[in-house]
Amino acid sequence: MRITSAIASLLLVGTATSLQNPHRRAVPPPLTHRSVASRAVPVERRSNDFEYLTNKTARFLVNGTSIPEVDFDVGESYAGLLPNTPTGNSSLFFWFFPSQNPDASDEITIWLNGGPGCSSLDGLLQENGPFLWQPGTYKPVPNPYSWTNLTNVVYIDQPAGTGFSPGPSTVNDEEDVAAQFNSWFKHFVDTFDLHGRKVYITGESYAGMYVPYIADAMLNEEDTTYFNLKGIQINDPSINSDSVMMYSPAVRHLNHYNNIFRLNSTFLSYINGKADKCGYNAFLDKAITYPPPTPFPTAPEITEDCQVWDEVVMAAYDINPCFNYYHLIDFCPYLWDVLGFPSLGFGPDNYFNRSDVQKILHVPPTDYSVCSETVIFANGDGSDPSSWGPLPSVIERTNNTIIGHGWLDYLLFLNGSLATIQNMTWNGKQGFQSPPVEPLFVPYHYGLAELYWGDEPDPYNLDAGAGYLGTAHTERGLTFSSVYLSGHEIPQYVPGALTASWSSCLVELIVFPRRGTTPLNFS
């Protein structure tokens, strides 16, 4: 089946009632105003019986009641530096949060941010950690949608030179990254006695390079004592060339969202003409068909005259000086941000650059920045995009891979991910054989009822959205999930959708949901 408009492949929801508000289909009409008596609450982690506290781990223990600015007990966690030797010559910083979920006793989940050179503490503090301090908020708050409610999670700054991990970097390509990471991971497993645990690797953005290469190296070890890999998830990932991920989809995406961009008709005519002339639209029309075409089209070259993404972004700044390509619906003023990312307005300080924060995390005085100015790859990343290399093999060997993408990301585009998938061959076939249009449903929860009646939920961020939030399509061990209202960081913008998605990966089945998307209480 051919779909001539690239965006159209995800606009089709495939239901007879598509004109009905999809967010209300599963909601019965209210009868009377009633209070919600029973409510789920965020996990309160106040036990002194720390499961992972041993003589080996005591030096990493973080006092969960003394984290600066955090006025609640974060519970058991461990942070510090472990060596990445023998393949590396430095150490990597980690912050490990055990879960109170009894179903998580035999697994460990790894979270990696991208960059290259961006700290995974960004993911912890503003996306899926047990406490959040997101842009525009006054102070840290508990995160009812923390992934630690589902599983044990470790956030790692890697490669060396990223975040709290001391440099200089000595990696030249993704094979070096994987070798140094897996050397570090063996030290981590030995320290916390995690031998034989099921391992899941997750991340976003440039982690679309990191995760498949690390996963491939783990599987190649054939050593389930340390590398019992069971699945991966990569969101808004860098998995192909810039031509496919950024430039070919840029103008089609602008057209779809120009009610937000509000660029004038003269510019639209000019930039659409350039996209046609450069071959971007023709490439998408051929690439995003189901099943994929044979032969598959070659992505256009990015010449000096074909840098359409750059021109769109420059024009967007003229209309909206606070345009944020990580989340294209941001407007002025910038939200102040303790990290300065992904909101572009810096706050009064850099939280992780504070000496009291660094002391409690057991790191030496460090000039921390969320995305390091240190060069990670001195001569550029020498590896091919992961979709050309290890990603298809990882899909085949785990049969449990999720690629997620937010529609409101204007840096790496969902149609870039789709075009990439259609050019990959795994488990005997190339690409998806049918369009990825099945709706992703996230269950409703009590907090939304409080909002309906005008009550103030407690805590407010409990009220992540519910209903039909995107699409989720699975073929031959690969799931592609799109999220309508998310930018580059899905756990930050639409936590319920990402929690549902990751919950499915943990049981090696793509079923929505498994452990739930409402706040969990295992106490």
Curated annotation (Swiss-Prot):
Q: Which domain of life is it from?
A: Eukaryota
Q: List this protein's GO terms for biological process.
A: proteolysis
Alphabetically sorted, this entry's keywords are: Carboxypeptidase, Glycoprotein, Hydrolase, Protease, Signal, Zymogen
Mutating H488A: what's the consequence?
Answer: Impairs catalytic activity
Which cysteines pair up through disulfides? They are none
Give the E.C. number(s). Answer: 3.4.16.-
Propeptide residue range(s):
19-52
Q: What residues are glycosylation sites in this protein?
A: N55, N63, N89, N149, N264, N353, N399, N415, N423
Family under the similarity heading? Belongs to the peptidase S10 family.
Q: What does this protein do?
A: Removes acidic, neutral and basic amino acids as well as proline from the C-terminal position at pH 2-5.
Q: Provide the protein name.
A: Carboxypeptidase cpdS
Q: Which organism is it from?
A: Aspergillus phoenicis (Aspergillus saitoi)
